[in-house]
Amino acid sequence: MTQRVRTRFAPSPTGFIHLGNIRSALYPWAFARRMKGDFILRIEDTDVERSSQEAVDVILESMAWLEMDIDEGPFYQMQRMDRYREVVAQMVESGLAYRCYMSTEELDALREAQRERGEKPRYNGFWRPEPGKVLPEPPAGVDPVIRFKNPIGGSVVWDDAVKGRIEISNDELDDLVIARPDGTPTYNFCVVVDDLDMKITHVIRGDDHVNNTPRQINIIRALGGTPPVYAHLPTVLNEQGEKMSKRHGAMAVTGYRDEGYLPEAVLNYLARLGWAHGDAEIFSREQFVEWFDLEHLGKSPAQYNPEKLAWLNNHYIKVGDNQRLATLTQPFIEALGGKVEGADLAGVVALVKDRANTLKEVAQAALLFYRGEPQADAALKAEHLTPEIQPALAALANQLAALPEWKREAISATFKAVLAEFGLKMPKLAMPVRLLVAGQLQTPGIDAVLELFGRDTVLRRLAAAA
């Protein structure tokens, strides 16, 4: 019987979560969904001083925005301390781990001497019990660390789904501290216990964890478990080619939402930031899940390209449902001081969205419909609202008032009739109408703009020219 796939995302809540971080959630989420398995969220909050509930909330908010649903969790490592201590005690009792009384000063001196000899700094196994070895009496008043008895000789070998076969000699690994003098377990140990208890089958994470993997595999095997499949993802680089980080200017995932990016655009972009399905650039969430596999994960670092993300966001705005976009755009309009009333916002969005890369830009383009009475520049009025144009404006207003239906086509036909009657070119009439109705010279098509403003508003504002 095939084992059910179980993946996990295990962030540390020590800062905001950026695109590079959330990609490490997207791929295990997609793999679990593709394989009809389970996706678990685990919060690795053992760094008590740096961890915060605010950071946890941002992680949950970011995942919810991208619709990365979880099947189990969130589990918090700080709430599992009793379990970790239980396993540490079992390992000491069974001889898999031991108490080490070497002080920090002694360890520092040992490492310095090793460096001077050109050796790799490492613990020398002084307190490691072996058959026939006589250990000194533990020093009084010293709380020991607990070290894992790493295998001597041989190698740790695993077939990484991204990096291929990796082999590390056990001689390169010293006996890892799994519990500190105060009894608190260490990171690598907690990860192993969690992965075993949660029956994780695939660990898809950043390649900054590669060096932890041989240590974790040895502990897993010592505890009688089977190591999961590992897939270590190459780093995500920023525009300057540096590792993406807050220090180097990375923006929080929620920042993209607040700037007016759509979740489907960000998800589509993230999916391609280290994985490919042929030449497919644009695909839905459902297609991504259907296509996702570990075999096509990239082996080289992926570089963030804001222009590509903006292009994708523009695509999703252009093809997006106008009513949904209107709902998402309204807060941006209100943030600009607009009051959404009168013109149908879904219709306005449909009119202005094609050139917008973000919902903020949609809102800026839509604002002319929602900022109250137009305040056109006096110089522009003097230039365009000349005595010569007044008869044509009056005729236009009269004919618009008589329209049986306030539709774009009828408005356009009315303009053409007035232009023909007075022998005018479109700009000569459209410019003053734009100033009077919208308060600016640049707008989308005048017939569409007037239709959205509505008959009453248009006629009232045109009357101001009289």
UniProtKB/Swiss-Prot annotation:
Reaction(s) the record says it catalyses: tRNA(Glu) + L-glutamate + ATP = L-glutamyl-tRNA(Glu) + AMP + diphosphate
Matches recorded under InterPro entries: aa-tRNA-synth_I_cd-bd, aa-tRNA-synth_I_codon-bd_sub2, aa-tRNA-synth_I_CS, aa_tRNA-synth_I_cd-bd_sf, Glu-tRNA-ligase_bac/mito, Glu/Gln-tRNA-synth, Glu/Gln-tRNA-synth_Ib_cat-dom, GluQ/Sye
Subunit structure: Monomer.
Keyword Ligase carried by entry: yes
GO cellular component: cytosol
Sequence motif 'KMSKS' region, residues: 243-247
GO biological process: glutamyl-tRNA aminoacylation
Protein name as it appears in the record: Glutamate--tRNA ligase
EC numbers, comma separated: 6.1.1.17
Disulfide bond sites: none
Record GO terms (molecular function): ATP binding; glutamate-tRNA ligase activity; tRNA binding; zinc ion binding
Enzyme category, top tier: ligase
NCBIfam families registered for this protein in UniProt: gltX_bact
HAMAP family: Glu_tRNA_synth_type1
Annotated localization: Cytoplasm
CDD domains xrefs: GluRS_core
Family affiliation: Belongs to the class-I aminoacyl-tRNA synthetase family. Glutamate--tRNA ligase type 1 subfamily.
Key words of the record: Aminoacyl-tRNA synthetase, ATP-binding, Cytoplasm, Ligase, Nucleotide-binding, Protein biosynthesis
